[in-house]
Regions:
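Gram-negative bacterial Sec-dependent N-terminal signal peptides
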Residues: 1-57
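Surface-exposed loop/turn motifs in large extracellular/passenger domains
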Residues: 58-443
């Protein structure tokens, strides 16, 4: 094993082992698909991501919402489903402030039009554009409106479901969900349930002032839900180039672009941008910023040239993708990524940085883009880090790692590495400091 302060490996000078093609964990041949149900119109399809979300069908008994509202619009099981929502909601209060509240049954909305605006603010805690009571699912066909949700203290959320499924067919490029608060807030939140999005083309931003835990998309599911409908995953079909998710904390830790607290994250294709940025300089808190996080597995299809996952922190630990349990290595969680034409970046001022890290195995397809990790403190940095096996297709892009005082490894596989480095591929590790070491490949 080579070790030096700076180690650079070019594919033109090295022939690695034969490439290993990476695939998706849940292939169409192995995964049941329920999209063949006969319905008048289906507003969302998640093509066999391992779980198909609730489908939304148009019917003739829907009620439209237009005009202006300065109080919460409550819906119950006895009310008609909503058709097109084009209203403006201006609702302010001190706690549990909502634009639309699904109190029973299923909150079904055909479309939230582009001229719909949710201005919901709390002078203390708990502000929601759309919210439900316990056991109520949310089913939205198309979302094109604007959500401006704020709380002076904690828990501002654009859309929250307290049921088993929060399903949105299409979030259009006109859609905007803007969240501001000072602690624990979310763009879209499935509490004790699953979050399904067919197409993500809009913009979601969550900005916290002094506190912790900003999440763009969040599923907090059932810890015991290991089989069956899996009410704990985040599933996205197509993440378009116009789509973006940003989760930022000005002074706190816990920034997450997409997080499944107990389940999986599955994305068919990524052409948009996912960013997690933590302004915390607290060196006692690990896992400060993560672009995509899942307790179980992460399955990410191909990343186009415009696709990116970025995690940055002024404090401890930044990961572009992280699969596993934050408290240790009790889980064997895997990451599968298709071809990478875009960029995966992680930057930490004090703690560990890794483009992608799994507590199990990590598989990546061909790499023509960039995967990088850097730690400016005396901490480790890894381009790709697998506690077990690491496999890649042909690398014709760049995979790099840099640290100011510890170990840097571009490719790290605890149980071995299988890769092919193409003629234009660059595998680079840079480590500065007397005790620092750099490895292009380390196993």
């Amino acid at each position: 094993m080579h070790s030096s302060n700076t180690l650079r490996l070019n594919g033109a000078d090295y022939d690695g082992p034969a490439s290993l093609k990476s695939g998706m964990f849940n292939t169409p041949e192995k995964t049941p698909c329920h999209a063949r149900h006969r319905m008048q119109a289906v507003a969302m399809t998640l093509a066999c991501l391992g779980m198909l979300g609730t489908v939304h069908a148009q019917d003739t008994a829907r009620e439209d919402l237009a005009g202006a509202y300065d109080a919460t619009v409550a819906r119950t099981a006895s009310d008609a489903a909503l058709g097109t929502v084009s209203a403006t909601f201006n609702v302010t209060g001190s706690s549990n402030v909502r634009g639309i509240w699904g109190k029973s049954g299923t909150l079904s909305i055909g479309a939230i039009a582009g001229d719909a605006v949710f201005n919901v603010s709390s002078t203390a805690n708990n502000a929601f554009g759309i919210d439900t009571s316990s056991g109520v699912n949310v089913d939205i066909g198309t979302l094109a409106g604007t959500f401006n949700i704020s709380a002076a203290r904690t828990n501002a959320t654009g859309i929250r479901s307290y049921g088993k499924i929060l399903s949105i067919g299409t979030i259009t490029e006109d859609a905007l969900i803007s969240i501001t608060a000072n602690f624990s807030s979310n763009g879209i939140y499935a509490y004790q349930g699953r979050l399904d999005i067919g197409t993500m083309a809009g913009k979601i931003s969550v900005d916290l002032g002094t506190g912790n835990y900003a999440r763009g998309l969040y599923a907090y599911g059932n810890t015991m839900d290991y089989q069956g409908p899996r009410y704990k995953d985040v599933n996205i079909g197509t993440f378009s180039s116009t789509g973006s998710i940003s989760a930022a904390t000005a002074g706190g830790y816990g920034a997450r672009g997409i997080q499944s607290n107990y389940g999986q994250v599955n994305i068919t294709r990524l052409d948009g941008q996912i960013t997690a940025a933590s302004g915390s300089n607290d060196e006692s808190e690990d896992f400060s910023a993560i672009g995509i996080e899942a307790r179980e597995n992460i399955t990410l299809g191909d990343m186009g040239a415009t696709g990116s996952v970025t995690a940055t922190t002024n404090g401890m630990d930044a990961y572009g993708l992280f699969a596993g349990e934050e408290g240790g290595y009790q889980t064997h969680s895997n990451i599968t990524i298709g071809n990478v034409g875009g960029a995966i970046r992680a930057e930490a001022m004090a703690g560990t940085a890794a483009g992608a890290r799994s507590t199990g195995s990590l598989s990546v397809g061909n790499v023509s883009g960039f995967i990088s990790a850097s730690s400016t403190g005396a901490a480790e940095a890894y381009g790709l880090l697998a506690e077990f096996s690491l496999t890649t297709g042909t690398i014709n892009g760049t995979v790099s790692a840099a640290t100011a005082g510890s170990t840097a490894a571009a490719l790290m596989g605890g149980a071995g590495i299988t890769t092919t480095i193409g003629s234009t591929g660059v595998i680079e590790a840079t480590a500065t400091g007397n005790e620092a070491t750099g490895y292009a490949l380390y196993s």
